[in-house]
Swiss-Prot record:
Pfam families in UniProt: JmjC, JmjN
Protein name: Probable lysine-specific demethylase 4F
Biological classification of the source: Eukaryota, Metazoa, Chordata, Craniata, Vertebrata
Organism: Homo sapiens (Human)
Region (Disordered) residue spans: 426-474
Known function: Probable histone demethylase that specifically demethylates 'Lys-9' of histone H3, thereby playing a central role in histone code.
Length: 638
């Protein structure tokens, strides 16, 4: 490997810049491994400048009519370099309209001398005029003819998420497009499940990045808890909400190591596991991003923190990754005896599994189980259900001319993987194209059966419609003439209804749960859930007594003009029941007094005495100690 980069082996958390040749650019996984061998991962961020002869797309003059369904106005509050950010949904608009808005006097980039001057203006402008971000648009602008570093076909081990579990999460294992303007911001965060990410700036003004080295990530978390105590109390992993902005000045004053780098059009930025990053756009631009994984990530994924309030929880089972790529520790991990320690300093690859042969080992196990072989995903991607606004195809049709790839003979493999623990076994992947969809998974198949495409958990549950396509057909982006752009952006449709989800790799103790809510749609209880063994019971051993002098407040919701109940303002307090075995227990609106017939027995007199002294709530708890609604009154006991 003779690739040129801008600094020697990284020992000081410097953000490295790499200049691969066209030959080196051909193998994405190999080049990422080379970058880590040079210490690029220690900074948490690296830049890759592709060869001059490489192009992601020949031209971008045919994307003006792509629809941005949900533009987000970024409103900030705070002072002294510490701000919180929230989003207001705006009316849908075309990319051409968004470009015109971004270049208008109200939103255009202010005059500046250089990047450093613009950076100072950025932090001084908060709160200021809130910009509008065209973020999280499911789709890709890479042409099918682009084989190297095509974000829709990276071919990393993250493909196992769909191949083994049948799970597609938009923005995680499918690309997202981002149309930005001056001051649009991505707040401090790590990637979902602490994955890698790659960001390509297709065209437009630069993007400035800040990053904290992974080995100092916990220091940033401690500082954030001090600066945002309210958010921290509400959620242990509140940084995953992407609402916290902390300026470089504040980081310096608190001794948090960080680096900055400016990305320009035609350049890639790679973030590494547990690398906290943030940044802003200098003006109108278009970027594309997706997550990916390497064997080194698996240990990070095992211990990745999660949003505890459920607002930004994106998680999936690590079973397939550990079982296939770390078979020597699978049994220990399955019984929660695998004491994983993440080494932020040195890249680690399991000795028994090299990155280059994981696809062959999957094929070997499938062949041993008597299933049809899986088409190699380096040259062919699975068929998925997609939304109408997905991957761009200006001509509106046509089949993908993706060459096939024969699976290599595996008789010389040194070991055979254990069979899948999933209820329906491993999925058969087939089909071509670049299907993208917010939470729409390629349907898993059993041998010899044909099923409809399933919808799996969405990354943020903001999809407004579903569609499907025949195998070999390109999905379509939604254009302005296909929707009414003068209407407000649609809100979430509410709780998703899961159809059949065979092929899921949930823990075995979750697989038989049921029955389904809809008898006409038999379904598994949801994709890739953790085992019930890991769920700690929160029921107290003794139910506290509530004396009659304590007033128990009940939650009352107001009605609208139509007489319907209004939703609570804080939607985070509403428990979203995503799975068929969950049911909502209604809170009673009043307490019924228990009547006791006259009885001369000592037991009856004792019951009457307790009823008078401690009230009906205590009696209800005695009758049924596990009844859930009296437990809601515990906080009122003083």
């Amino acid at each position: 490997m003779k690739s040129v980069h801008s600094s020697p082996q990284n020992t000081s958390h410097t953000i490295m810049t790499f200049y691969p040749t066209m030959e080196e650019f051909a193998d994405f996984n190999t080049y990422v491994a080379y970058m880590e061998s040079q210490g690029a991962h220690r900074a948490g961020l690296a830049k890759v400048i592709p060869p001059k002869e490489w192009k992601a797309r020949q031209m971008y003059d045919d994307i003006e009519d792509i629809l941005i369904a949900t533009p987000l106005q970024q409103v900030t509050s705070g002072q002294g370099g510490v701000f919180t950010q929230y989003h207001k949904k705006k009316k849908a608009m075309r990319v051409g309209q968004y470009r015109h808005l971004a270049n208008s006097k109200k939103y255009q980039t202010p005059p500046h001398q250089n990047f450093a001057d613009l950076e100072q203006r950025y932090w001084k402008s908060h709160p200021g005029n809130p910009p509008i971000y065209g973020a999280d648009i499911s789709g890709s602008l890479f042409e099918e003819s682009t084989k190297q570093w095509n974000l829709g076909h990276l071919g990393t081990i993250l493909d196992l998420l769909e191949q083994e579990c049948g799970v597609v999460i938009e923005g995680v294992n499918t690309p997202y497009l981002y149309f930005g303007m001056w001051k649009t911001t991505f707040a401090w965060h790590t990637e979902d499940m602490d994955l890698y990410s790659i960001n390509y700036l297709h065209f437009g003004e630069p993007k400035t990045w800040y990053v904290v080295p992974p080995e100092h990530g916990q220091r940033l978390e401690c500082l954030a808890r001090e600066l945002f105590p309210g958010n921290s109390r509400g959620c242990e992993g509140f940084l995953r909400h992407k609402v916290a902005l902390i300026s470089p000045t504040v980081l310096k004053k608190n001794g948090i190591p960080f680096n900055r780098m400016t990305q320009e059009a035609g350049e890639f930025m790679v973030t590494f596991p547990y690398g906290y990053h943030a940044g802003f756009n200098h003006g109108f631009n278009c970027a594309e991003a997706i997550n990916f994984a390497t064997p080194r990530w698996i240990d990070y994924g095992k211990v990745a923190s999660q949003c505890s309030c459920g607002e930004a929880r994106v998680t999936f089972s690590m079973d397939a990754f550990v079982r296939i790529l770390q078979p020597e520790s699978y049994e220990l991990w399955k019984h929660r005896q695998d004491l994983t320690v993440v080494d932020y300093m040195e890249p680690r690859v399991a000795e028994s599994q090299e990155p280059s042969n994981w696809r062959e080992d999957i094929a070997l196990r499938r062949a041993a189980l008597g299933l049809r072989h899986l088409r190699n995903h380096i040259t062919s991607c699975p068929t998925r259900t997609v939304a109408p606004r997905l991957c761009y195809n200006p001509k509106g049709g046509g089949t993908d001319a993706v060459p096939g790839s024969a699976i290599q003979a595996l008789e010389t493999s040194a070991w055979v993987l254990p069979p899948s623990t999933g209820r329906w076994g491993p999925c058969r992947g087939c089909g071509r194209g670049r299907g993208r969809g917010r939470g729409r998974g390629r349907r898993p198949r059993e041998l010899g059966t044909e099923e409809t495409t399933v919808q799996s958990a969405a990354k943020r549950r903001l999809s407004v419609g579903t569609g499907s396509r025949a195998p070999g057909r390109k999905p379509q982006l939604q254009f302005a003439d296909e929707a009414l752009t003068d209407k407000p952006a649609p809100l979430s449709g509410g709780l998703p209804h899961f159809a059949k989800a065979s092929g899921c790799c949930c823990a075995p103790d979750l697989q038989p749960l049921g029955p389904p809510l809809d008898p006409d749609e038999p379904m598994h209880p949801g994709p890739c859930l953790l085992s019930l063994d890991s769920t700690a019971s929160s029921l107290p051993l003794v139910v506290p007594m509530t004396p009659p002098s304590v007033t128990v407040p009940l939650i009352t919701l107001s009605r609208d003009t139509g007489g319907d109940w209004k939703s609570p303002v804080n939607l985070a307090k509403v428990v979203a029941m995503d799975h068929s075995y969950a049911s909502r227990v209604p809170v009673p609106t009043k307490f019924s007094r228990i009547s006791w017939a006259p009885d001369s027995s000592a037991g009856a007199k004792a019951r009457q005495r307790y009823a008078t002294e401690f009230g009906d709530i205590f009696l209800q708890c005695m009758i049924n100690p596990l009844d859930p609604w009296p437990l809601n009154m515990v906080s009122n006991v003083k």
